[in-house]
Regions:
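N-terminal secretory signal peptides that target proteins for export/translocation
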Residues: 1-6
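Bacterial N-terminal signal peptides
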Residues: 9-21
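Bacterial Sec-dependent signal peptides at the C-terminal "C-region" and cleavage site
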Residues: 18-34
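Flexible, processing/modification-adjacent segments and terminal tails
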Residues: 30-39, 46, 107-185, 208, ...
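N-terminal mature ectodomain segment of secretory-pathway/periplasmic proteins
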Residues: 39-118, 153-158
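Short amphipathic beta-strand/extended segments with alternating polar/hydrophobic composition
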Residues: 75-80, 100-105, 119-130, 214-217, ...
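Short, surface-exposed linear segments at secondary-structure transitions and domain or protein termini
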Residues: 82-89, 109-113, 130-135, 222-226, ...
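Gly/Pro-enriched, hydrophobic low-complexity segments
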Residues: 92, 164-260
Length: 263
Protein backbone atom coordinates (compact mmCIF):
# COMPACT_ATOMS: atom_id res chain seq x y z
CA UNK A 1 0.00 0.00 0.00
CA UNK A 2 1.24 3.40 -0.90
CA UNK A 3 1.68 5.68 2.05
CA UNK A 4 -0.52 8.73 2.03
CA UNK A 5 1.17 12.10 2.22
CA UNK A 6 0.66 13.92 5.49
CA UNK A 7 -0.45 17.54 5.01
CA UNK A 8 2.19 20.09 5.90
CA UNK A 9 -0.20 21.91 8.22
CA UNK A 10 -0.79 18.71 10.20
CA UNK A 11 2.97 18.07 10.44
CA UNK A 12 3.42 21.56 11.77
CA UNK A 13 0.64 21.08 14.30
CA UNK A 14 2.09 17.72 15.41
CA UNK A 15 5.51 19.29 15.70
CA UNK A 16 4.23 22.07 17.91
CA UNK A 17 2.24 19.67 20.08
CA UNK A 18 5.15 17.23 20.41
CA UNK A 19 7.55 20.06 21.14
CA UNK A 20 5.25 21.44 23.82
CA UNK A 21 4.85 18.00 25.38
CA UNK A 22 8.59 17.38 25.40
CA UNK A 23 9.21 20.84 26.83
CA UNK A 24 6.64 20.26 29.56
CA UNK A 25 8.13 16.85 30.38
CA UNK A 26 11.66 18.25 30.37
CA UNK A 27 10.60 21.18 32.54
CA UNK A 28 8.89 18.89 35.06
CA UNK A 29 11.94 16.61 35.19
CA UNK A 30 14.23 19.62 35.56
CA UNK A 31 12.08 21.05 38.34
CA UNK A 32 12.16 17.71 40.16
CA UNK A 33 15.94 17.50 39.80
CA UNK A 34 16.38 21.05 41.03
CA UNK A 35 14.08 20.40 44.00
CA UNK A 36 16.18 17.36 44.87
CA UNK A 37 19.35 19.42 44.49
CA UNK A 38 17.96 22.14 46.77
CA UNK A 39 17.03 19.55 49.40
CA UNK A 40 20.47 17.92 49.34
CA UNK A 41 22.19 21.32 49.41
CA UNK A 42 20.17 22.48 52.41
CA UNK A 43 20.87 19.23 54.25
CA UNK A 44 24.58 19.63 53.54
CA UNK A 45 24.60 23.19 54.90
CA UNK A 46 22.66 22.10 57.99
CA UNK A 47 25.22 19.35 58.66
CA UNK A 48 28.04 21.94 58.50
CA UNK A 49 26.52 24.23 61.13
CA UNK A 50 23.53 25.77 59.37
CA UNK A 51 22.76 29.20 57.96
CA UNK A 52 22.44 30.91 61.40
CA UNK A 53 26.13 30.08 62.02
CA UNK A 54 27.03 31.37 58.54
CA UNK A 55 25.20 34.64 59.11
CA UNK A 56 27.16 35.21 62.34
CA UNK A 57 30.52 34.54 60.67
CA UNK A 58 31.75 38.03 59.85
CA UNK A 59 35.52 37.78 59.58
CA UNK A 60 37.58 35.06 57.90
CA UNK A 61 41.34 34.63 58.06
CA UNK A 62 43.28 31.90 56.30
CA UNK A 63 46.42 31.04 54.39
CA UNK A 64 45.85 29.43 51.00
CA UNK A 65 48.80 27.07 50.54
CA UNK A 66 49.72 25.21 47.36
CA UNK A 67 51.69 22.00 47.78
CA UNK A 68 53.45 20.25 44.90
CA UNK A 69 55.13 16.88 45.40
CA UNK A 70 55.06 17.44 49.14
CA UNK A 71 56.68 20.89 49.05
CA UNK A 72 55.08 24.30 49.53
CA UNK A 73 55.27 26.32 46.31
CA UNK A 74 52.90 29.21 47.09
CA UNK A 75 51.18 30.83 50.06
CA UNK A 76 48.67 33.68 50.17
CA UNK A 77 47.46 35.15 53.47
CA UNK A 78 43.86 36.38 53.47
CA UNK A 79 41.58 38.39 55.74
CA UNK A 80 37.96 39.18 54.82
CA UNK A 81 35.28 41.24 56.51
CA UNK A 82 32.28 39.55 54.93
CA UNK A 83 29.88 42.24 56.16
CA UNK A 84 31.65 45.23 54.59
CA UNK A 85 33.61 43.54 51.80
CA UNK A 86 36.96 44.83 53.08
CA UNK A 87 39.77 42.48 52.12
CA UNK A 88 43.47 41.98 52.70
CA UNK A 89 45.71 39.62 50.74
CA UNK A 90 49.44 39.19 51.09
CA UNK A 91 51.79 37.05 49.06
CA UNK A 92 54.62 36.90 46.54
CA UNK A 93 54.00 37.61 42.86
CA UNK A 94 55.39 35.74 39.85
CA UNK A 95 58.52 37.89 39.83
CA UNK A 96 59.27 37.00 43.44
CA UNK A 97 58.25 40.42 44.80
CA UNK A 98 56.29 40.47 48.07
CA UNK A 99 53.01 42.38 47.87
CA UNK A 100 50.14 43.52 50.06
CA UNK A 101 46.74 44.62 48.77
CA UNK A 102 43.95 46.24 50.79
CA UNK A 103 40.71 46.65 48.86
CA UNK A 104 36.96 46.17 48.90
CA UNK A 105 35.54 43.20 47.02
CA UNK A 106 32.32 45.08 46.23
CA UNK A 107 33.89 48.22 44.75
CA UNK A 108 37.22 46.61 43.69
CA UNK A 109 38.91 49.82 44.84
CA UNK A 110 41.88 49.90 47.19
CA UNK A 111 45.62 50.27 47.62
CA UNK A 112 48.61 48.05 46.93
CA UNK A 113 52.22 47.82 48.07
CA UNK A 114 54.98 45.95 46.22
CA UNK A 115 58.33 45.48 47.94
CA UNK A 116 56.99 47.80 50.63
CA UNK A 117 56.44 50.66 48.16
CA UNK A 118 53.01 52.06 47.30
CA UNK A 119 51.95 50.91 43.84
CA UNK A 120 50.58 53.51 41.44
CA UNK A 121 49.10 53.60 37.95
CA UNK A 122 49.19 50.42 35.91
CA UNK A 123 51.07 48.52 38.60
CA UNK A 124 48.33 49.33 41.11
CA UNK A 125 45.59 48.30 38.68
CA UNK A 126 47.28 44.97 38.02
CA UNK A 127 47.73 44.30 41.74
CA UNK A 128 44.07 45.08 42.45
CA UNK A 129 42.93 42.85 39.60
CA UNK A 130 45.16 39.99 40.76
CA UNK A 131 44.01 40.41 44.37
CA UNK A 132 40.37 40.19 43.33
CA UNK A 133 41.16 37.01 41.43
CA UNK A 134 42.77 35.56 44.54
CA UNK A 135 39.67 36.46 46.55
CA UNK A 136 37.37 34.71 44.06
CA UNK A 137 39.51 31.59 43.73
CA UNK A 138 40.83 31.08 47.24
CA UNK A 139 37.63 31.75 49.19
CA UNK A 140 35.74 29.42 46.87
CA UNK A 141 38.15 26.59 47.60
CA UNK A 142 37.44 27.14 51.29
CA UNK A 143 33.74 28.01 51.29
CA UNK A 144 32.13 26.47 48.19
CA UNK A 145 29.48 24.38 50.00
CA UNK A 146 28.37 27.47 51.91
CA UNK A 147 27.76 29.30 48.61
CA UNK A 148 25.49 26.80 46.87
CA UNK A 149 22.56 29.20 46.94
CA UNK A 150 24.38 32.41 46.01
CA UNK A 151 22.74 34.58 43.32
CA UNK A 152 23.64 33.37 39.83
CA UNK A 153 24.43 29.80 40.91
CA UNK A 154 22.34 27.11 39.23
CA UNK A 155 22.14 23.95 41.30
CA UNK A 156 20.98 20.72 39.65
CA UNK A 157 20.76 17.13 40.84
CA UNK A 158 23.13 14.94 38.80
CA UNK A 159 22.14 11.55 40.18
CA UNK A 160 23.44 9.09 42.73
CA UNK A 161 26.83 7.42 42.48
CA UNK A 162 28.91 5.11 44.66
CA UNK A 163 31.11 7.18 46.97
CA UNK A 164 34.85 6.53 46.83
CA UNK A 165 35.45 4.35 49.87
CA UNK A 166 31.92 2.97 50.05
CA UNK A 167 28.34 4.10 50.51
CA UNK A 168 26.26 6.22 48.17
CA UNK A 169 26.66 9.87 47.23
CA UNK A 170 24.21 12.38 45.81
CA UNK A 171 25.96 14.49 43.17
CA UNK A 172 25.12 18.18 42.74
CA UNK A 173 26.06 19.99 39.53
CA UNK A 174 26.89 23.68 39.77
CA UNK A 175 26.82 26.05 36.82
CA UNK A 176 26.91 29.83 36.84
CA UNK A 177 24.99 32.64 35.19
CA UNK A 178 27.03 35.82 34.72
CA UNK A 179 28.82 35.49 38.06
CA UNK A 180 32.48 35.08 38.94
CA UNK A 181 35.46 35.52 36.65
CA UNK A 182 34.91 32.30 34.68
CA UNK A 183 31.15 31.71 34.39
CA UNK A 184 31.59 28.70 32.07
CA UNK A 185 33.13 26.64 34.88
CA UNK A 186 31.26 23.51 35.97
CA UNK A 187 31.50 21.79 39.35
CA UNK A 188 30.14 18.52 40.68
CA UNK A 189 29.88 18.23 44.46
CA UNK A 190 29.67 14.73 45.94
CA UNK A 191 27.62 14.59 49.14
CA UNK A 192 27.41 11.46 51.28
CA UNK A 193 23.97 10.20 52.18
CA UNK A 194 25.27 9.09 55.55
CA UNK A 195 25.81 12.29 57.54
CA UNK A 196 25.58 14.64 54.53
CA UNK A 197 29.30 15.34 54.22
CA UNK A 198 30.99 16.79 51.14
CA UNK A 199 33.43 14.11 50.08
CA UNK A 200 35.01 15.64 46.97
CA UNK A 201 34.38 17.89 44.03
CA UNK A 202 35.09 17.58 40.34
CA UNK A 203 35.42 20.53 38.01
CA UNK A 204 35.93 21.56 34.42
CA UNK A 205 37.10 25.13 33.94
CA UNK A 206 36.15 27.59 31.23
CA UNK A 207 33.87 25.26 29.29
CA UNK A 208 36.77 22.96 28.34
CA UNK A 209 36.08 19.45 27.04
CA UNK A 210 38.80 17.90 29.22
CA UNK A 211 37.93 15.20 31.77
CA UNK A 212 37.01 16.69 35.16
CA UNK A 213 39.71 17.29 37.76
CA UNK A 214 38.92 15.70 41.13
CA UNK A 215 39.93 17.07 44.53
CA UNK A 216 39.04 15.41 47.81
CA UNK A 217 37.69 17.56 50.64
CA UNK A 218 39.33 16.27 53.81
CA UNK A 219 40.31 17.33 57.33
CA UNK A 220 36.95 18.83 58.31
CA UNK A 221 37.14 21.04 61.39
CA UNK A 222 34.73 23.31 63.23
CA UNK A 223 35.74 26.98 63.05
CA UNK A 224 33.51 29.65 64.58
CA UNK A 225 30.51 27.35 64.34
CA UNK A 226 31.21 26.38 60.71
CA UNK A 227 32.56 23.08 59.46
CA UNK A 228 35.40 23.74 56.99
CA UNK A 229 37.61 21.39 54.99
CA UNK A 230 41.27 22.33 55.37
CA UNK A 231 42.92 19.81 53.04
CA UNK A 232 42.19 19.25 49.34
CA UNK A 233 44.50 16.73 47.65
CA UNK A 234 44.10 16.33 43.88
CA UNK A 235 43.31 12.80 42.79
CA UNK A 236 45.97 11.44 40.43
CA UNK A 237 48.06 14.62 40.56
CA UNK A 238 50.97 15.70 42.81
CA UNK A 239 49.14 18.83 43.98
CA UNK A 240 47.34 19.69 47.18
CA UNK A 241 45.54 22.78 48.48
CA UNK A 242 45.85 23.33 52.22
CA UNK A 243 44.37 25.96 54.49
CA UNK A 244 46.42 27.06 57.48
CA UNK A 245 46.06 29.74 60.18
CA UNK A 246 42.29 29.59 59.75
CA UNK A 247 40.05 31.66 62.02
CA UNK A 248 36.38 32.63 61.84
CA UNK A 249 35.07 35.41 64.08
CA UNK A 250 31.76 37.21 64.66
CA UNK A 251 33.52 40.59 64.97
CA UNK A 252 35.99 42.57 62.89
CA UNK A 253 39.61 43.19 63.83
CA UNK A 254 40.31 46.64 62.36
CA UNK A 255 44.06 46.16 62.59
CA UNK A 256 43.92 43.51 59.86
CA UNK A 257 42.69 46.07 57.34
CA UNK A 258 44.92 48.97 58.34
CA UNK A 259 47.63 50.09 55.90
CA UNK A 260 51.23 49.33 56.84
CA UNK A 261 53.21 51.96 58.68
CA UNK A 262 55.27 54.26 56.49
CA UNK A 263 58.96 53.27 56.35
Amino acid sequence: MKARAVPAALLAALGVALGAALAATGSAESDARDAKADAVGKELIASMGGMPAWEKARQFQFDFVVIKEGKEVARFAHAWDRYTGDYRVKGVDKTGAPYLVLFNVNTKQGRAWVNGVVAEGEQKSKQLEAAYGRFINDTYWLLAPWKLFDPGVHLAYDGEKPCPGGGMCDVLKLSFENVGLTPKDLYWIWVTRDGRRMLQWQYVLGGASDPPTTAEWKDWRKMGGLMLSLDKPMVGQPFEIRFENVAVAPARDDSLFAPPAAP
